């Protein structure tokens, strides 16, 4: 299997969806397609979601087809794979980089695509979901949210590459990728039953009005607060801060993992010493909530980031890996 990803053009993406759905009543091998027929919804950032569930930023939200698969499987809040100034081979990601035999571990981090390439994947996914939700009756075409994710420091986020990524996902209509998707839809109207030119023209190009900040383990509290304030006040975005499980403190984390059957997971105290603690986080969150409220935006937290643990049995290459999945759940709640 190749470890190099190649993007799929929008024409190929849509042709695959149409053909697979017509022949097998599935999309990207998702057979239990979710059709929303209820009346219970949840509002966030002025958008009404059909449900608040969806994938976190990860390899499964890195490609357009994976995002489409998440949507047809029922996801309605989709956190896009984190981008930063580094990408591709520069990240130095060893292979394999994910072990999910039981609880999950990884040694990967941000998108392997350059930020502008990642942006194109997210635009294609947005446009595809807008089309298939309407055409196949999967749900309200406005009933889902894309949430972009950036990292890992203020200088990197202000870099023109990442700034362009943010601005273009806030309003994508001027991008070449958006224009290509729109042109394809208008040229293929004969293949649709429930989509017409007026609907295509009405598709909102405001893909992301919210953002999740991911910071490196060990990032100081004042740096985190500065980034969040910048994203709120300068970028005019609703912001989620991804918090680390280390907020709980070493003793609490050790006890929770022990009593829930994960006593074999090993880690040291160093990470707890360099990460912000609860005494730093709570007042910072309260300050940022006030900043957001002052300009009509929302600030919240995402629980939680992955948890750094020791590689002790060759699970993955290297000395440290990041834990997620069911073993992270007791720390999160």
Give, region by region, the residue ranges found by the protein language model.
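A structural motif corresponding to the C-terminal end of an alpha-helix
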Residues: 168, 203, 226-237, 280-299
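Glycine/Thr-rich beta-alpha phosphate-binding loop at enzyme active sites
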Residues: 22-36, 249-333
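Active-site-proximal loop/turn and secondary-structure-junction residues that shape catalytic pockets
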Residues: 59-61, 84, 243-249, 305-309
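Conserved, mostly hydrophobic/aromatic
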Residues: 55, 241, 301
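N-terminal capping/small domains of soluble enzymes
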Residues: 1-234
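Extended, H/D-rich, highly charged conserved domains that either
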Residues: 219-236, 240-253, 268-279
């Amino acid at each position: 299997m190749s470890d190099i990803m190649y993007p799929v053009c929008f024409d190929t993406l849509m042709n695959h969806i149409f053909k697979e759905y017509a022949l097998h009543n599935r999309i990207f091998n998702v057979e239990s397609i979710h059709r929303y027929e209820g009346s219970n919804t949840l509002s966030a950032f002025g958008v009404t979601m059909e449900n608040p569930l969806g994938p976190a930023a990860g390899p499964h939200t890195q490609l357009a087809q994976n995002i489409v698969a998440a949507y047809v499987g029922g996801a309605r809040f989709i956190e896009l794979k984190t981008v930063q100034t580094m990408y591709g081979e520069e990240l130095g990601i060893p292979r394999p980089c994910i072990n999910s035999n039981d609880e999950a571990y990884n040694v990967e981090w941000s998108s392997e695509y350059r930020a502008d390439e990642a942006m194109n994947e997210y635009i294609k996914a947005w446009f595809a979901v807008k089309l298939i939700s309407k055409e196949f009756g999967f749900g309200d075409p406005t009933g889902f949210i894309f949430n972009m994710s950036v990292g890992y420091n203020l200088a990197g986020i202000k870099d023109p590459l990442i700034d362009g990524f943010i601005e273009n996902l806030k309003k994508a209509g001027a991008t070449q990728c958006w224009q290509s998707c729109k042109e394809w839809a208008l040229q293929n109207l004969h293949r649709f039953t429930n989509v017409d030119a007026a609907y295509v023209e009405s598709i909102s190009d405001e893909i992301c009005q919210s953002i999740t900040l991911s910071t490196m383990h060990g990032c100081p509290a004042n740096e985190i607060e500065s980034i969040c304030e910048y994203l709120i006040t300068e970028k005019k975005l609703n912001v989620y801060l991804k918090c680390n499980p280390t907020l709980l403190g070493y003793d609490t984390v050790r006890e929770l993992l022990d009593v829930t059957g994960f006593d074999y997971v090993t880690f040291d105290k160093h990470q707890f010493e360099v990460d912000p603690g609860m005494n730093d986080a709570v007042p910072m969150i309260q300050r940022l909530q006030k900043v957001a409220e002052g300009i009509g935006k929302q600030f919240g937290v995402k629980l939680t980031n992955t948890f750094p643990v020791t590689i002790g049995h060759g699970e993955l290459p290297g000395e440290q890996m990041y834990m997620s999945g069911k073993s992270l759940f007791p720390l999160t709640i």
